[in-house]
Amino acid sequence: FIQATDSHTCMGGASNALTYGVGSTEYANLVHNQFAFVKVPESIRFELEGELNPGCTAKDVILHILWRYAKYSDTLDRSMEFGGPGLASLSMDERATLCNMATECSAKTGICEPDQLTINWLLERRSDLSEKVIRDAFVLPDKDAHYDGGIHTINLNEIRPMVAHPGDPDEGVPSDPTNGAYIDEIGDVKINIAYAGSCTAGKDDDFSYYAMVTKAALDAGMKIAEGVECYIQFGSKTVKDLSERNGWTDLFEAAGVKLIDPGCGACIGAGPGVSNNPDQVTVSAINRNFQGRSGPGKLYLASPLTVMASAFTGKITAWHPDMFSNG
C-alpha cells in the first residue's frame, strides 16, 4: 500500500500495488503516525481480451475507457481493476499507462492483476525478493467478487487509434480527457506542437515507440514537419540514459526533435511545449487537456505512436508501420 503526494501515484498499480495520491496534510499525518485510515473504495473491473493492433498502445485503451466509461461517471471514486487474458500482452510500462490515467477517470486508483511478468519485473529490480515471497504478496480479487461498477470486457483487437479532443467550451463542450474520437473520423487537424513524454508517456517503452517512428521517418528522408515544434521529455534519468545507450537520442536530434530533461513540464503549463496563443494546436502524449492547462491553445491527447507520427506529417495521424515507406 503506497501513498504519495502526486495525483498520478496510482500508476504504481501496474506492479499490483495499491497506490493512492493524497494531499500534503494527509501525507504528513501518515509520516508522523505511520498509519492511515482508508475507506475501501468500490471497484470496477475491466476484463481485457485479445491483443492490440499495430498503431495502438495502452494509451488508446485508456482513452477508450475515458470516453465510454469515465464520461458517465462509471469509474468515479472507484478502484479500476485491470485483468483478463489480454493483460498478458501488455508490458509493465503499458500497464503503468492504464493505471496512471485512472486519475483522469476520476477513480480512486488503478491496479493490475499480477502474473509472471509482474514477478519477473520485480525480481529484476529487487535482489532481496524471491518468487515465492512475491506470489505470497499478490493482491487478487476474491472468487465471485461483486463489483459495484460491474465487469466490462474490452477486446484489445477492436481498439482503434484515438484522441481526446479539446471540445468547444464556448459551445458548452468542455475541454476534457473524456472527449474521445477516432483519428480516422476527425478529418485533417493540422498541428503546431507535438509533445511527447510526461509521467504517462516518458517510460522505456514509450521511448522505443518514439524511436521506431523517428527511424522510419529518417529512413524515408523525412524530418519534423515544417511549422511543427516537436518536444520529447525524458520520464527519468534512467530513461534518458537508456535513450543515449540505444542511439535513440541521436535519432531524435537528427530528425529535429527538441529534447527536455525529466521533470513536470507542459502538463502543468511549465517550460517548452506550452502553446502561446489560442490558435495553436497541440497533439500530446500527456494525460490532461483541460483548457488553459498547457497554454491557451487547443490540445489533443493521443498515444506516443500517434504523437510522433503526427510530428512528421504535420497533422494528427495514426501510426502504421508502412506509412512513410508508402510515401
List PLM regions with ranges:
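Fe-S-dependent hydro-lyases/dehydratases of central metabolism
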Residues: F1-G327
